[in-house]
Amino acid sequence: MIDLSTIAAQLNARTILPEGIVVITLLVVLVGDLILGRSSTKWTPYAAIVGLLGAIVALYTQWDSSNTIGFLGAFNADALSIAFRGIIAISAITTILMSVAYIEQTGTPLGEFICILLTATLGAMFLSGADELVMIFISLETLSISSYLLTGYTKRDPRSNEAALKYLLIGAASSAIFLYGISLLYGLSGGETRLTAIASSMANAGSANISLALVIALVFAIAGISFKISAVPFHQWTPDVYEGSPTPVVAFLSVGSKAAGFALAIRLLVTAFPLVSEQWHFVFTALAILSMVLGNVVALAQTSMKRLLAYSSIGQAGFVMIGLLANTEAGYASMIFYLLVYLFMNLGGFTCVILFSLRTGTDQISEYAGLYQKDPLLTLGLSLCLLSLGGIPPLAGFFGKIYLFWAGWQAGLYWLVLLGLITSVASIYYYIRVVKMMVVKEPQEMSDVIKNYPPISWKLPGMRPLQVGLILSVLATSLAGILSNPLFTLANSSIAKTPMLNSALVKTVEANSVASQLDFSLPSKN
């Protein structure tokens, strides 16, 4: 006889309550849009925001839960996943606020856009807690396919179609590479799919052949993850996709998708690859160096705000990798804190870009010349967000970088931290270049677009949500610096409450000693 209570205990469906709320919200928006048509745009954005806020409340109720394993080990609702899922949900809320006016102007259905965005959010949230290979791949593909659809959503725009095609082709290749890597893990572990079981199985085997194959699996898995976080040299899609995609979509990809990628990186590398810890540290060190240097250097030559922010996001990914490479409690906590403040300063910057493009139809940096004289509030908001991205005190970005660099320095990553400081200083130049251009005082230096700058009416449909999103982002960017200590304490608490990371930090030395005894060379032919 089937014991339903045992099955219910093993499934532990409460672990995915936040995702369940997002699914219900998605269905409400979808059905409402089908029944009411265009008139549903008056309430669908707010219904989606309420649902996402409900998901955040559900995440809060799970904070101190000790029963975090659900669905036979496929999902882990530990504090680490709660932190990342919260960041993803907040990024989705902000994206919805900034997208209403933009999507309405393009003439495409808003309800469908929100449904696809909620699906991408759902995939990213599941990916943050996925603890099993099948769950990881399904979540990753849910996020990826939704992202492709969002990228090409404004189908009347040829740039959007081109961006979607490039993203689809490169993303499909990346997914195939990642799938090959995790299929190797499945074979090496003797058919295990849970990450902890895979690590235990390979630790018990420990032969030279398994070690070589494990490194190959590691390389393929890192390639797939690097595509998702836009790490060099897997970044080629980023500038073109960011430039051609709808700006709210770019904002979500730069934060929500990237946060999910880093959550996957932590869980997969720490849990499944402890025997090759030195190898993945070496690979990510190279990725961090390339991302920080190329991202911040190439950004200096950009003439489009969206391309500038694209290369900026590549450089920011390099900074976040320092926390991953530190492999300490402070390192992982600094990653979470930086992604949280990066959410607000980056989305705030994109909100300002949307406001400017709605009124001028351009995102060229040269057209921002003299903006202060016509729109001082927009100039102030964009300046604060850009200066925070550059790490200027006392804004949130400064404290985020301080925590990352300090964690890296304590872990002995001296040259990497010094390179991070140098490239961070270089990034300040291209951020301040935009700020300086906006505050020119001479009338003859103003761009033609600014000379004919139209007045804004906040009473137009979708403008109020955009205004709220901008105010919240700018305030958070400004105040998060003052509140950095309690926010970092919260991030540190999420690491301390995660058994996976605690055990990994304790066993790092043991794993390295075991790995040093393994032979990674190819067998010689007799």
Curated annotation (Swiss-Prot):
List all disulphide bridges recorded for this chain: none
Instruction: Kindly state which keywords UniProt assigns to this record, in alphabetical order.
Output: Membrane, NAD, NADP, Plastoquinone, Quinone, Thylakoid, Translocase, Transmembrane, Transmembrane helix, Transport
Asked whether the keyword Repeat is assigned, the reply is no
Q: Which GO terms describe its cellular component?
A: plasma membrane-derived thylakoid membrane
Does this UniProt record's set of keywords contain Transmembrane?
yes
Q: Which GO terms describe its biological process?
A: ATP synthesis coupled electron transport; photosynthesis, light reaction
Note the InterPro entries from the entry: NADH-Q_OxRdtase_suN/2, ND/Mrp_TM, Ndh2_N
Tell me which Pfam families the record gives.
Answer: Ndh2_N (PF19530), Proton_antipo_M (PF00361)
How is this protein situated with respect to the membrane?
Multi-pass membrane protein
Segments spanning the bilayer are: 16-36, 43-63, 80-100, 110-130, 133-153, 168-188, 212-232, 246-266, 280-300, 308-328, 336-356, 380-400, 402-422, 468-488
Q: What PANTHER family does UniProt report for this protein, alphabetically? A: NADH DEHYDROGENASE
Q: How does it assemble?
A: NDH-1 can be composed of about 15 different subunits; different subcomplexes with different compositions have been identified which probably have different functions.
What is the protein name stated in its UniProt record? Answer: NAD(P)H-quinone oxidoreductase subunit 2
Give the gene name.
ndhB
